[in-house]
């Protein structure tokens, strides 16, 4: 019986010591965590900027813009012509209809 009591007492003391050590452990510094996070994000942004090379990116954007413009200008002109023709036909149709009173 004494052996059982000693074992229970020993287990209790060990678990209390463990809990005490966990409470005394320092909590991570949130400000340090945030500064480390922002440093990581900043360095990642710098690396990404160096990898993309702004001149290459600007040239790609310019070529995409030119291709888009080449494709859209004829479509816009055609749509404008068709709209003008439709409005002209509507006006002529109004003129040719007799006035009903």
From Swiss-Prot:
GO molecular-function terms, A-Z: apolipoprotein receptor binding; cholesterol binding; cholesterol transfer activity; enzyme binding; heat shock protein binding; high-density lipoprotein particle binding; high-density lipoprotein particle receptor binding; lipase inhibitor activity
Places the protein is found: Secreted
Record's keyword annotation contains Nucleus: no
Annotated GO biological process: cellular response to lipoprotein particle stimulus; cholesterol efflux; cholesterol homeostasis; cholesterol metabolic process; diacylglycerol catabolic process; high-density lipoprotein particle assembly; high-density lipoprotein particle clearance; high-density lipoprotein particle remodeling
Signal peptide: 1-18
Modified residues annotated as Pyrrolidone carboxylic acid in this record: 24
Presence of keyword Coiled coil: no
Keywords of this entry: Cleavage on pair of basic residues, HDL, Lipid transport, Oxidation, Phosphoprotein, Pyrrolidone carboxylic acid, Secreted, Signal, Transport
One term under GO cellular component: chylomicron
Quaternary structure note: Monomer. Interacts with NAXE and NDRG1.
Entry similarity comment: Belongs to the apolipoprotein A2 family.
Described purpose of this protein according to its UniProt entry: May stabilize HDL (high density lipoprotein) structure by its association with lipids, and affect the HDL metabolism.
Protein name: Apolipoprotein A-II
Organism of origin: Heterocephalus glaber (Naked mole rat)
